[in-house]
A protein has these predicted regions:
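Short loop/turn motifs that connect adjacent beta-strands in outer-membrane beta-barrel proteins
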Residues: 8-12, 56-68, 83, 100-108, ...
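Residues that define the transmembrane beta-barrel architecture of outer-membrane proteins
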Residues: 11, 41-47, 85-91, 136-142, ...
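Transmembrane beta-strands of outer-membrane beta-barrel pores
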Residues: 19-25, 53-55, 74-80, 114-122, ...
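Extracellular loop and loop/strand-boundary signature of outer-membrane beta-barrel proteins
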Residues: 33-37, 79-82, 128-134, 169-176
Length: 187
């Protein structure tokens, strides 16, 4: 019983780091250059630090979800316009798994992230009147990524892919155009 119980509780821990450059979709005139800098806001960069775990393959959950991983992450984001948008920090939960195993060392995976972003420069009628994209200092963060995952060594992976991100306050404050990013990721 002791050995079986031990197998039920052991998890595999992972630490990861992602760099995600992105293209900001021009959803309104503020992003197209109708802002204080009179320049398009069309680039983003985010740096992610993630902790993940997966269940032991011999546990009940490990047998149900043998390749799934889940965890928490934190990221720093810039849109190269700190005076009008800020440089938000995101805290999020994530989950991912292979969609298809392409070879013994290469898989095509998905990963979703969901959390809260803090540190935005929100719309202000006097001090930030052109920013109709972000209406609150705290916004939801939603991300979906598709990744090629290459197992370099039993302890090391290299991942590269594309992802789609949406920042929004869910219409709790206006204006709320939201911010959409289409990007790449390496980690």
């Amino acid at each position: 019983v002791g050995g079986n119980l031990k197998a039920q509780t052991i998890v595999k821990h992972q630490i990861g780091f992602d760099i995600r450059p992105g293209y900001v979709a021009p959803t309104n005139s503020f992003l197209e250059g109708d802002n204080a800098r009179q320049k398009t806001i069309d680039q983003s960069l985010s740096l992610h630090l993630k902790y993940a775990f997966r269940f032991n393959k011999d546990s009940r959950l490990g047998r149900l979800y043998p390749h799934a991983y889940q965890g928490i992450g934190v990221s720093y984001n810039t849109f190269h316009s700190p005076a009008e948008l800020g440089n938000p920090v995101v805290v999020y939960a994530f989950q991912g798994a292979p969609i298809v195993q392409l070879s013994p060392l290469l898989s095509f995976d998905y990963e979703w992230n969901f959390g809260a972003s803090f540190g935005w420069k929100k719309y202000d009628g006097l001090y930030n009147p052109q920013n109709e994209v972000i209406g609150s200092k705290i916004n939801a963060y939603i991300n979906l990524g598709f990744i090629l995952n290459w197992q370099l060594h039993p302890q090391w992976k290299l991942a590269a892919g594309v992802d789609f991100t949406h920042f929004s306050n869910g219409n709790t404050h206006y204006p709320n155009g939201g911010l959409n990013v289409i990007g790449g990721r390496v980690g």
